Amino acid sequence: YGVCLDYAHAALSKVAPEEWAKRLGRYVKHVHINDNDLVSDLHLAWGDGKINRQVFYDSYDKYMSKASVLVETSSYENKRRSFEVLKKEGFI
């Protein structure tokens, strides 16, 4: 079995998102990413909010590297911009 870690939801919790990744990492089969303002679940393009992307990349590489990733944004344009950031930052 496994779990889906919604990283944007984790970023809104009282527990640091990298702690979620560390504790659940061996069970994480799938990850949802998008950005937010650390207050509300906005489904912004990756890079348009306040989530620390480098912490995500490091956590993914260390704890969840075999998990699939879904860019879960509110529009096609936000997905396109997210992929541009992910490519520019070397994640994909």
Region locations from a protein language model:
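Histidine-acidic metal/acid-base catalytic patches
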Residues: 1-5, 10-92
